[in-house]
Amino acid sequence: MVPRTPWHDEALVVFGEVARDAARHFIQWWNIHKVFSFSNRLFILPKTYDDKEELTVHNWKEFLEDHPCQINGQCVRSIGPWSASTKTTETSILNAYIQMIDGAEHFIFIENEFFVTVANDSFIQNPVSETLYQRIVRAHRLGEKFRIYIVLPLLPGSDNVNIVQASLYFIMRSIAKGDNSLFKRLEIAGIQPNDYISFFGLRQYDILMGRLVTETIFVHSKLMIVDDQMAICGSANINDRSLLGERDSELCVVINDIEEEQCLFNGRSVRVGKFFSSWRRRLFSMILGTMRHNENDIDVSDPVSDQFYNYFREVAHKNTLIYEEIFGVLPTNCVRRFDQMYNYTDKPKLKDTDPNQAHEKLKNTQGLVVDYPVYFLDEESYLPSLRTREGISY
């Protein structure tokens, strides 16, 4: 057996017309691949529905703990001639991301396995970074209180060194490495990036066979929640493979909440979706460690205020410093060049020099959140050689 890193994912259960559309997408995909692969498996025929009553699900209590919420949903896809034999390439997932980011009024929360989106780049074509940049610039110009939280895996999920290098290289180029990165473009525009946008990872610790150990939590979600009013969730990563429609086939659901409730954002009363607000609060509570024990009475309902945004960042940074001192974790902002790597990793680690003190310090960590190391190896170029498959593919 090969041990697997801890895993974090988010998903949806949907009923009604949007579920029917998801089924029809699968049928279309299944049938065209049967043709291409000359498989003996049977074709699937979609069921015909005469009215909406047939779509009603009465046995939801068998697989849901709580009563389902009412929402408006729409399936969106990345799909094209090669993957589904369509006449045109469909990029409705990308269109949804762009429209939702541009229309966000208060905050954006993203969990994704990738963040590969570079403006003005000859390789990376999707405009997610440009849209985030323009939304932040607009917030800065108008004096708006606007926040973006992005949670990513601390390392790409692969045991292939070339894949890890290539993925990490382009993620860092997207965030802070080079003049076309999101952070650098904001700084050139006179904007402090962390006033509006922050990147985070997830990490945990435990005692294994009498020794303190730590492990990153691999974020596999493909989720964006906007203003606690709408969301997109599905299979699409934030990269060209998932968003341009000409490569991987993807399916997501865009959801608007119907049931609303009152909430305060930065001291202002706003209407938020009942479903999305509860979903986002649950995620923040898990990330900050307040789901079961909330000794400091932290209110996660307002993601916009300076108080909460700074608290979120402070918890992440405090946790990061503790993990670096005790375990010498990688990746880290302490290592910006290869020649700094060994100096950092060779330093005595508190888990070895004083395990009892290390364990006491680890009790001061809160939740799972840590800083995303946006400046890790930012003075180095580690893109795999173009002679490798991974170097060519990017």
Show where each model-derived region lies:
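Charged, low-complexity intrinsically disordered terminal segments
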Residues: 1-394
